[in-house]
């Protein structure tokens, strides 16, 4: 449940919003015993945000800021009795921001650059002695995308590069969608990934994937 206010001023759009996500996706964690089904917990939290867009000729600028209050985070807690550490959840506050620009080279080509980052606020102050936040308290990504619509829209080429802001991982992809007839369309894609051992994408280091999909409409 929430509300939004929007203003449009000479090529710019500005909006403010607030919402309470009481039906948000459940937060899952491993059972304390280490065996059995995962434990679920309601992940309701308050979300406040602001968004601004500005068009300057062929250039579109955008900025989004979001504040999340009492969002659940996984924390590793050491036992004072010398038992094995266990994973618990704590409600913490998070701040995120996204900035981007999109430039229309012509009617068929455009290029987009975006940067996003998020961080837990006062994460160290929220943790007691013996508690450690699982994962990074701050993370971010940069995205560069080029797209070209060819043959009167029958073919669409897209080249995408995505990297973590700390350069711990890099993903590159090339895709081509082509409409053969009114009933047939084909999509091909190549994805290459590089990641450091401590990255969330470590299992995909030096990974190369190729795929093709044929769609028939009738």
Regions found by a protein language model. Give the residues of each.
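Residues that define the transmembrane beta-barrel architecture of outer-membrane proteins
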Residues: 1, 42-48, 55, 91-97, ...
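Residues on the lipid-exposed face of transmembrane beta-strands in outer-membrane beta-barrel proteins
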Residues: 3-7, 50-54, 99-103, 144-148, ...
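Repeated loop/turn-to-beta-strand initiation elements of outer-membrane beta-barrel proteins
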Residues: 11-14, 58-63, 108-113, 152-157, ...
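Transmembrane beta-barrel strands of outer-membrane/channel proteins
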Residues: 16-20, 63-67, 113-119, 159-163, ...
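Gram-negative outer-membrane beta-barrel proteins
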Residues: 22-28, 69-75, 107, 119-127, ...
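Extracellular loop and loop/strand-boundary signature of outer-membrane beta-barrel proteins
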Residues: 33-38, 79-88, 128-133, 160-162, ...
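Long, well-ordered mid-to-C-terminal structural blocks that present hydrophobic/aromatic surfaces
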Residues: 42-129
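Outer-membrane beta-barrel "beta-signal"
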Residues: 190-192, 204-218
């Amino acid at each position: 449940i929430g509300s939004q206010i929007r203003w449009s001023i000479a090529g710019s759009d500005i909006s403010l919003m607030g919402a309470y996500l009481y039906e948000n996706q459940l937060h899952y964690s491993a059972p304390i015993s280490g065996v059995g089904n995962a434990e679920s917990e309601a992940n309701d939290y308050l979300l406040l945000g602001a968004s601004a867009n500005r068009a300057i000729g062929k250039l579109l600028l955008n900025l989004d800021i979001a504040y999340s209050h009492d969002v659940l985070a996984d924390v590793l807690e050491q036992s004072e009795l010398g038992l094995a550490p266990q994973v618990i959840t704590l409600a913490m506050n998070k701040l995120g921001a996204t900035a981007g620009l999109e430039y229309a080279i012509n009617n068929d080509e455009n290029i987009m650059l975006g940067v996003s980052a998020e961080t837990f606020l006062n994460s160290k102050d929220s943790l007691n002695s013996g508690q450690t936040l699982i994962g990074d308290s701050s993370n971010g990504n940069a995205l560069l995308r080029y797209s070209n619509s060819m043959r009167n829209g029958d073919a669409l080429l897209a080249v995408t590069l995505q990297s973590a802001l700390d350069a711990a991982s890099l993903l590159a992809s090339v895709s081509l969608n082509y409409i053969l007839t009114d009933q047939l369309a084909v999509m091909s894609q190549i994805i290459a990934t590089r990641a450091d051992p401590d990255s969330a994408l470590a299992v995909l280091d030096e990974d190369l994937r190729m795929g093709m999909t044929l769609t028939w409409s009738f």
